[in-house]
Amino acid sequence: MSQYAPFVKPYIEYNEFGWGPSDLPDLEVPYQPFCKGDRLGKISDWTTPVQERKYNNNKYMSTFGSSNSQYAYFHGNDDASFHLVNGNNMRALKPYQRNRYRPTQRNNLRLHGRNGRFNAAIGAGHGGAGAAGGAGASNKYGKGRDMRRGQTGRRFMRAAPVRQRQSSVVVRSDWVSIEEIDFPRLLKLTLPNIQEGADLITCGTLEFFDKQCDRINVKNERPLQKIDRIINVPGTIDDPIIRRLSKSLGNVFATDDIIATLMCCTRSNYSWDIVIDKVGTKLFLDKRDNAQFDMLTVNETALEPPLEEEGSINSPQSLSLEATIINHNFSQQVLKIGELEPKHKFDEPNPFEEPGVELASIGYRYKQWQLGDDMVLVARCKHNGVLRSPGGELQFLSIRALNEWDSKAANSVEWRQKLDSQRGAVLASELRNNACKLAKWTVEAVLAGSDQLKLGYVSRLNRKDHLHHVILGMQQFKPQEFATQINLNMDNAWGVLRCLVDIMLKQPDGKYLIMKDPNKPMIRLYDIPENAFDSDNNDGEETSDDRPFLNSKDNKL
């Protein structure tokens, strides 16, 4: 037995009292560190080349490709002479044509070579498609080209950041919300067959339009002058004519700018508010004292409205003040001003005259409309000038001005380059950026019964100078035709007004507020106390940070 090697029995642990492994610890067992909290899947590998990201790409795809080299098998001898044939679908280049399409062929050669190199690099990173034909193989059109196209699309299709606008008035805790109406509901309303309003009282004095202003163009521009005239714009309750008419006529009383704001509310983005006093069966729609209701907005409906920059001449507050002053000066400069110039006087004088104050040329019409169901609207409308037609008839005008401040910052067309040759492009740009303002001007002209709506184009003398301006041209429209051109449905406008009036007439007597939500396309109706806007209860409520366009100007220009 000594000639054979000894046989030693191995020790086997036997569990005599149970089923399963014994209590002895595991020794010499292959082990790789891991964490029980890790998700089952692909462990991050920072040693592989950086791969191009692609939308909806499988995050576990490269686990089974050749790029996961942690557990890959390498054999350097047998595969040393192995080379992968390029499997890309190479499009054959067109034969060279002498002196023809030379730039196209040169670009074709350059782009083709660039795409080939790019695809090879991407393929090597995605499972070795460029070197081993793994799971990251190129598709029909080339993986690199698709990736580059996808990245470009995401780069230029980023959504603009949402800007939080400030409310026109701070909603207090003691205000009771009555109703919230979103714009899609308002856009479905309609009230057809509203007849032209009937004149009740006409008052004021109008000056004649200077026809020489129609000849102004870019090459023959005219400086905008500062006209020291005052336009008093009292509210509905402060109007003595409306007070007199309310005793015998109508049950809804307002001004043309208030009605236009309600009719065009679905086009507005900035916040605004209107105060309503209900007394018995009568409604008085009015604006708050010292509010910025009469200020004009600039680029309100643009894709990129002006930024809130304190102290900047291109902030919404500064542009609003600039546009309001331009509109006032322009409406007076295009008229024949002088003691000897002819004037058209209405039946009654201006009810807002003040001794020692020169008033602007303006005429008022107090008109009434039948809205059905014994509802009569009485409103104060206005004209800015008058013109005698070739036939000798008087035509009443509504004169407004559009202003250019910085075409690059506003993402608009350059007026000095396009106004004479492509005036339609300029107007289309303004309709896109100032849709609400133009719609309200059109509604005011339609309500007043103006024969023409004259629009002036006023630009800065220098884009960095907001104090000096020039007139570059004028354009005139018939209000009804212009409403159709800008897609303004008057039946829907009357329907919106009637809907809001019906809601208010159902409420008990008191004071109410209609407010456009600053950040949502909806209007809100509140029941407010009688002293909601008194000076004693208004301390700390409305500041320059609470309302847009505050501390810009006083109501009087």
Swiss-Prot record:
UniProt entry tagged with the keyword Cytoplasm: yes
One GO term (biological process): regulation of translational initiation
Pfam families: eIF-3_zeta
Biased composition (Basic and acidic residues): 545-557
Compartmental location: Cytoplasm
Keywords for this protein: Cytoplasm, Initiation factor, Protein biosynthesis, RNA-binding
Region (Disordered): 533-557
Record GO cellular component, one term: eukaryotic translation initiation factor 3 complex
Annotated region described as RNA gate, given as residue ranges: 292-306
Keyword Transcription belongs to the record: no
UniProt-listed InterPro entries: eIF3d (IPR007783)
A single MF term (Gene Ontology): translation initiation factor activity
Role description: mRNA cap-binding component of the eukaryotic translation initiation factor 3 (eIF-3) complex, which is involved in protein synthesis of a specialized repertoire of mRNAs and, together with other initiation factors, stimulates binding of mRNA and methionyl-tRNAi to the 40S ribosome. The eIF-3 complex specifically targets and initiates translation of a subset of mRNAs involved in cell proliferation. In the eIF-3 complex, eif3d specifically recognizes and binds the 7-methylguanosine cap of a subset of mRNAs.
Comment block on domains: The RNA gate region regulates mRNA cap recognition to prevent promiscuous mRNA-binding before assembly of eif3d into the full eukaryotic translation initiation factor 3 (eIF-3) complex.
Protein family: Belongs to the eIF-3 subunit D family.
Subunit structure: Component of the eukaryotic translation initiation factor 3 (eIF-3) complex. The eIF-3 complex interacts with pix.
Name by which UniProt lists this protein: Eukaryotic translation initiation factor 3 subunit D-2
Organism (species): Drosophila grimshawi (Hawaiian fruit fly)
Gene behind the chain: eIF3d2
